[in-house]
Amino acid sequence: TLQYVGTAKQRTPWQRFKYRLTRRYVSEKPWFLVIGPPGSGKTSLIGESGERFLLAEHYGLQQTVDVGPTQDCNWWLAENSVYVDTSGEWLQLNGLGEEGARARDTLFKLIRRHRRHPGIDGIMLCLDARWLLHASLTERKSVADALRVRLLEMASWFRSELPVYLTISHLDQL
C-alpha cells in the first residue's frame, strides 16, 4: 500500500482521473481476502478500518451498529486497497454446502482470471477474543484445523504463499 500511495501522489489531478477510468486502477491496488468464523467481526473490521471507500457517499453508505452476517461475499473498494469480505460459513470444515463451495470456487476463479498473479496480496484472518477465551479445546482445535485446510486451499488456488494477517476482534469486550 505504501508503494501505491507514493505513486498516486506523483500524478496530476487529470492523470489520476484518467487512471481511475482504467481497469488497472483496481488491479494495481493490494487485494485482501478477509476470512474468519461467523460473527468474528470481519465486516466491522473493514468498515471501521479508517479507509476511505470509493463511492460510499454517492450510494449513501454509512456505518451501522449491526451489520449482520455476510451471505457469500462483499467487495469493498477503498482508496488504497480492495477487500473481499467472505462469509464465515466458508471456514467450516464439513458444514459448507454445495452452493457455498460453488460460490467460493467461482470467486477464486474470477479473482485469478481478472487479477493475474498473485491474485490476492494477503489474507486477513479475524478471530473473536471472546470466543477464543470461552471455547472448548475441541472447538478451538476444530476451527484451527478448518483454518489450516482453507489457507492451504487458498495458497493452491492462487499459486503462491500468501501472508496471513491475524486480527483479534472484540478485545474491548473482555
Predicted regions and their residues:
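Conserved G1/Walker A P-loop phosphate-binding module
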Residues: 2-91, 118, 170-172
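Conserved P-loop NTPase mechanochemical-coupling segment
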Residues: 86-92, 130-135
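Conserved C-terminal guanine-recognition region of P-loop GTPase G domains, centered on the G4
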Residues: 98-174
